């Protein structure tokens, strides 16, 4: 079953990306490189919810 998760940036506190993941296949927190408008570069966003 896929659940919706929120991706947040620890440096700026942004929570602007929403994605889904399969909890059975990836039980630990997801980390993706996404674009941060505040920093104007790609940084690591981690799973918040």
Swiss-Prot record:
InterPro entries named among the record's database cross-references: Ribosomal_bL33 (IPR001705), Ribosomal_bL33_CS (IPR018264), Ribosomal_bL33_sf (IPR038584), Ribosomal_zn-bd (IPR011332)
A GO biological process held by the record: translation
Keywords: Ribonucleoprotein, Ribosomal protein
PANTHER family: 50S RIBOSOMAL PROTEIN L33, CHLOROPLASTIC (PTHR43168), LARGE RIBOSOMAL SUBUNIT PROTEIN BL33C (PTHR43168:SF2)
Protein family according to the UniProt entry: Belongs to the bacterial ribosomal protein bL33 family.
Record's protein name: Large ribosomal subunit protein bL33A
GO cellular component, one term: ribosome
Protein's organism: Lacticaseibacillus paracasei (strain ATCC 334 / BCRC 17002 / CCUG 31169 / CIP 107868 / KCTC 3260 / NRRL B-441)
Sections of the chain in a coiled coil: none
GO molecular function, one term: structural constituent of ribosome
UniProt superkingdom: Bacteria
């Amino acid at each position: 079953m896929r659940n919706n998760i929120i991706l947040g940036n620890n440096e700026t506190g942004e929570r602007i990306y929403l994605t889904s993941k399969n909890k059975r296949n990836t039980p630990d927190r997801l980390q993706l490189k996404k674009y941060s408008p505040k920093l104007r570069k790609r940084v690591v966003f981690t799973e918040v919810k």
